[in-house]
């Protein structure tokens, strides 16, 4: 499980994002006949407390200018759409875990606002 452009002699797992590295670390904990399906939904420069909502369409997902996370915002709808599509693709696919990495774009907001908004998003994701 390595990115095709990774130089294994240098200990590289992947060259884009953290997904391949995380998947490689999870492999010892899953059955030998199972696999890991990555559903990337990240958006550079996104945040909960700042940014543009953008738009969403079922055909193309969140628009390029969507940079704000939150319940029912375009990035959230994109997350749900991608996750449901991955689960529907194969009846054996099961949602096992979500890895969330938040960047520094929420630095200007208050921790209380961020925690509340993230908690609401997690609750909604579990319900959807």
Regions found by a protein language model. Name each.
Residues 1-128:
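Cell-envelope and extracellular/periplasmic
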């Amino acid at each position: 499980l390595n990115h095709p452009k990774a130089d294994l002699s240098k200990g590289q797992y992947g060259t884009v994002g953290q997904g391949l590295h995380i998947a490689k670390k999870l492999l010892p904990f899953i059955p030998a006949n199972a696999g890991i399906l990555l559903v990337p939904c990240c958006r550079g420069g996104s945040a909960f407390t700042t940014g543009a909502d953008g738009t969403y369409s079922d055909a193309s997902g969140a628009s390029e200018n969507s940079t704000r996370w939150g319940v029912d915002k375009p990035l959230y709808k994109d997350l749900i759409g991608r996750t449901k599509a991955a689960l529907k693709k194969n009846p054996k696919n099961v949602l096992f875990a979500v890895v969330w990495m938040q960047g520094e774009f929420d630095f200007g907001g208050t921790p209380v606002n961020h925690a509340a908004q993230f908690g609401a998003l997690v609750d909604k994701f579990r319900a959807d």
